[in-house]
Amino acid sequence: YIVTDVLYQTANKLKQFIQAGQAEEKYLQDFFKVLSQDQLEQLGWTGNQQDTNDQILMRPTIISAALYGHNQVAIRQAHDLFAEYHDHLVDLPADTRGAIIKNELQHYLSAEVFHELLNTYRTTTDPSFKVALRGALTSITDADLIQHLIGEFENAETIKPQDLRGWFQGLLANEFAHQYAWDWI
């Protein structure tokens, strides 16, 4: 696990040098796809009783890498899991829940799903689920939905003042949203 984890940490550092939409991004995504494909096939999406501790720890890293690499099989599997758990997303495995929800917003985005997830964030009391939802919601690329999300910054019923920093930071990290976030200030 340690070697694999360091490998993916190093590969993830390369994202800092890539701009969205550039040719280099496609090369990096292809690298992630190749790097994760066999491991994802071996590990699968859900754990079982025979999993070693290393397999349990590696699964979320491998799934995130496969999704970043635009592995079409992984994208469809994440979508299928989202659809299966749609009415009870909190029951998705906590270690992969954020990646599954983020995948849905990145590849199957609709305003309806966005608003459902934002409302789920508003009503849930599970802090780890809130973190997963925030991470996914701040990764959206649609300008209108980004502006709607920023409009919620001042609505304490949705985003509590103590949580605002995490939302702002998430949008700053999103190349499609960081200018909107700066403009809000």
Briefly describe each language-model feature range.
Residues 1-185:
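Long, ordered, helix-rich scaffold segments
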